[in-house]
Amino acid sequence: MNLGLAILLIVLAFAGGVALGIYLSRRQVENYIADKPILDENALRLMMSQMGQKPSEAKVQQVLRQIKSQQKVASKKK
């Protein structure tokens, strides 16, 4: 009986560690992306110019605000 209990405790500890590791790493990645977005102003300007649009400062800032607001809405849903 002691061997079965030991195996059960080891399996439960392993499963708990995996679940905690997944949760913490996901939270860390979400915080990193929120602090340092992947799409910055220069990348957005380059993308707009490749699509044939003239990237004015007002348009770039408008698109960045839209992206940030969508990220906030998406993070609140979770």
Swiss-Prot record:
TM segment ranges: 3-23
Record keywords, A-Z: Cell membrane, Membrane, Transmembrane, Transmembrane helix
Subcellular location(s) per record: Cell membrane
Alphabetical list of InterPro entries matching this protein: UPF0154 (IPR005359)
UniProt membrane topology term: Single-pass membrane protein
Pfam family, one: UPF0154
Keyword Cell membrane: yes
Gene Ontology CC terms: plasma membrane
Family assignment from sequence similarity: Belongs to the UPF0154 family.
Name of protein: UPF0154 protein SSU05_1707
